[in-house]
Design a protein with these regions (language model features):
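Multi-pass membrane catalytic core of lipid/isoprenoid biosynthesis enzymes
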Residues: 1-33
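Generic hydrophobic-segment detector
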Residues: 12, 19, 40, 82-83, ...
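Hydrophobic, well-structured mid-protein blocks that either form specific transmembrane helices
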Residues: 22-61
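C-terminal membrane-associated helical module and adjoining short loops/tails
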Residues: 45-179
Length: 179
């Protein structure tokens, strides 16, 4: 659905290039889902391998939401916005099929007691989102969309392993990946 929405909103004005970007996004989402289903149990559960498809959809649709909220309708007639939509669509699509680690939040435990500061932070986050939801949420989507590359670069600079795939339960450097 995100590829169809962004195509109708802006990419169709770019002709075959816009169609190709939407197709790449759809194909990448299908490959991402297939890889997610086959890698269960061999990938570190704290991270996703590549951007998860809901996050990619949020990134693409978040851009459409922000631009629509700003009053831009039928932007396939505005080349700069159409090309920006193309870049975001391709980025989201291709990032879904990379091996870049994206934090999954699966190790967050909401059943144990939560410190008071966390409750205050959640209330503050809700207040900030209510200031102007489209811009704040799109900014959060962008931060998450870039976070995987930041983690990848940091791990690579520190000399840590960047692959999330465990090939053996017996190798010491893969300890903890099969939880």
């Amino acid at each position: 659905a995100p590829a169809l929405i962004v195509y109708e909103w802006s990419l169709k004005g770019l002709g075959k290039v816009g169609w190709l970007a939407a197709f790449i996004y759809c194909s990448a989402a299908a490959l991402r889902l297939a890889r997610f289903n086959t890698n269960i149990g061999i990938v570190d559960k704290r991270f996703f391998q590549g951007m998860p498809s809901p996050a990619a959809a949020a990134l693409v649709i978040g851009f459409v939401w922000v631009m629509d909220d700003a009053g831009y309708e039928g932007v396939f007639t505005i080349p700069a916005l159409a090309w920006a939509a193309l870049a975001i669509t391709l980025y989201a699509g291709l990032t879904m099929v990379t091996n870049v680690p994206f934090y999954s939040f699966k190790d967050v435990n909401f059943r144990r007691s939560v410190p008071f500061i966390v409750i205050v932070a959640i209330a503050l986050a809700i207040a900030v989102i209510n200031i102007h939801a489209p811009i704040v949420l799109f900014a959060l989507f962008c931060v998450y969309g870039l976070s995987g590359y930041v983690v990848y670069g940091w791990r690579r600079a520190k000399g840590l392993r960047t692959s999330l795939i465990a090939t053996s339960k017996d190798e010491p450097e893969e300890e903890g990946l099969h939880r």
